[in-house]
Amino acid sequence: MSKSAVSPMMQQYLGIKAQHTDKLVFYRMGDFYEMFFDDAVEAAKLLDITLTTRGQVDGEPVKMAGVPFHAAEQYLARLVKLGKSVAICEQVGEVGAGKGPVERKVVRIVTPGTLTDSALLEDKETNRIVAVSPDKKYIGLAWASLQSGEFKTKLTTVDKLDDELARLQAAEILLPDSKNAPQLQTASGVTRLNAWQFAADAGEKLLTEYFGCQDLRGFGLDGKEHAVAIGAAGALLNYIRLTQNLMPQHLDGLSLETDSQYIGMDAATRRNLEITQTLSGKKSPTLMSTLDLCATHMGSRLLALWLHHPLRNRAHIRARQEAVAALESQYKPLQCRLKNIADIERIAARIAVGNARPRDLASLRDSLFELAQIDLSANGSSLLETLKAVFPENLSTAEQLRQAILPEPSVWLKDGNVINHGFHPELDELRRIQNHGDEFLLDLEAKERERTGLSTLKVEFNRVHGFYIELSKTQAEQAPADYQRRQTLKNAERFITPELKAFEDKVLTAQEQALALEKQLFDGVLKNLQTALPQLQKAAKAAAALDVLSTFSALAKERNFVRPEFADYPAIHIENGRHPVVEQQVRHFTANHTNLDHKHRLMLLTGPNMGGKSTYMRQVALIVLLAHTGCFVPADAATIGPIDQIFTRIGASDDLASNRSTFMVEMSETAYILHHATEQSLVLMDEVGRGTSTFDGLALAHAVAEHLLQKNKSFSLFATHYFELTYLPEAHAAAVNMHLSALEQGQDIVFLHQIQPGPAGKSYGIAVAKLAGLPVRALKSAQKHLNGLENQAAANRPQLDIFSTMPSEKGDEPNVGNFVDKAEEKHFEGILAAALEKLDPDSLTPREALSELYRLKDLCKSVS
């Protein structure tokens, strides 16, 4: 379109829009943000606001939509959640200062990953932006949180990119426009940047200038070895500068993260363990929602971070444990005080980018004074000593804010009443002129009534017409000659006098001057706070850590969590362990033991559907995870050896977007585990092979279990319905059979959820189907077919020889296939003997005795 054919204001808009073609432009016009042309159409649809027209361009009506300035946050929040970026264009010039339109410019760009406004953010979630820079060998990652000042980088590989993004939970991902990452093809929140912005040399130059250093070796970054990571960090920092229209001063020193710092968990594991999100995508009930007793939002965010980043450094874990133990008698008063603490972390971020509001500073002031009053007994905890020493360091900042900001300032700076009385003499004088106006008006009204003798005379004020003298219609004709008519009403006339006009000019001028001066003073306070940002961030981190540690103490005291022990030898010993989430959802939870060590590395877990196999496996993984966060664990006792990674293969789901079936997803996850698990890994495998035919599934399940035993040698919990797999312990001493018990009462079934030695006698699938409400006719038919299949299987035992067709790596036949056929009876006799030997009749309750009797009976049937 021709710019000469449009108004000067529209020319200005088109020039700004041309620089931000990929964003919606909020163009400030008075008390509204307006959008034009395609932006207006899109915004009207997304925000459900009115689409209208105004004027014409090239003969076509200009489409237009707008949102009120004071309500812009709620609309921005909706757009950001939809993955949109918005350029905020403000009026920066004085209205009427020149012949053309008022000067406007984009003051910031709101993108999903660069939010700082509390109204646009989830209180308990960390908002991160991640830069991804793929190279031939490695992928450079850099991520930051403008709210916390976090700034980190890492080298990773293509096969681990999904896992890293799942861990970081990025709100926005930056990617070079010349590079492709298959994992990001369907991802939302991806922003493409020019590839040159990811150049390592440009990145190093920008980073060294920002941190004021000669090179990046002090951050653990080598220019050659970490070039791709440095490029990602540089691109990220530059993007933040462009979107915020300034270089924020609160980003922590850049740090290089390595795999050895935390226990590794892939994307499937984080999903299956439901750490911060359920399998259905909800926020509750999850591990996070169940454990989150934090008093502050900062604490809740740090808790989520710790849960997703379990430590491997035993010294750091023990430091947290000692702090938790020291707080067990102090956590209640501490949490009461922490409830009065504002979100210092996010307030500091808003100070850094220059958009903090008056009440942010008031909340910061009150919080700093509150933190300084925290009095804790460290009880030998060096971590507590370090944390509590931080708070007095901010008292000088708190005192400066007390002097500068009113106890209860206005919400908006434009409304005035923000700067404290006595802070600036000129402001106090301007306020005196405004505030003593009532006395002048009362005196003027009394004097004018006496002078004119008009009883209906009143001196008043409104925002539209300013100050005026009002007379009734009957007395208006008697107004003195110096009364100048200002407004005519139905029953009254309004006048102005030279004396009243002079006072009005003085008051209005004082008001304008006071507002301008308050803005100037407030900006000065914000500028002075820039130097205090490192200490403010330090206080925020210390308060959040205290909040999480006191939450861990509350869990230990109120939910009977115990301090786990750590061993240098391979072991996972848990006495009466409980699932931390499930036990809060049910009236009675059955606790269970877990014993894995160098002799028994794989637990083959059998039992009925709904018997609790998946819950038990997740329980073990969550106890291990919690132990490495420094939290006490839901058990009577726990001893855990070295753990480097946790893997899970639980549940069934497809990936239609990538054209992968349920079985393909299952096999992909299984393959990843077999390629990456080590002797120090914990592996959870649930129903491997169920997505294909019986023989294929059984063969695959056997092969996977054997691979875990012989190659990976990981600690493994392997749940299966393939009863044939229960022969594995006879061939592999490191495998052990355990089962979840159930009790049959006629045609009904009672799940005892108790882990017992040996394999399960049956799966109770039809009984579970009955509980699910299958029609009686279908159940009878299923039972009939089951009886026929069992009879056929009994008459044709050789079908178990399926493994004999599978060549081993050495070319000979696998020993398990022949063993199943030849030693079946001996195996069952061994199981019966072992089960009887472990029974102590004198210690069993009637219910347990009956359960054991039924179990032994089922085993005897199998032998016969």
UniProtKB/Swiss-Prot annotation:
Membrane-crossing residue ranges in chain numbering: none
One GO term (biological process): mismatch repair
Positions contributing to ATP binding: G607, P608, N609, M610, G611, G612, K613, S614
CDD domains per the UniProt record, alphabetical: ABC_MutS1
Function: This protein is involved in the repair of mismatches in DNA. It is possible that it carries out the mismatch recognition step. This protein has a weak ATPase activity.
Family named by the database record: Belongs to the DNA mismatch repair MutS family.
Full protein name: DNA mismatch repair protein MutS
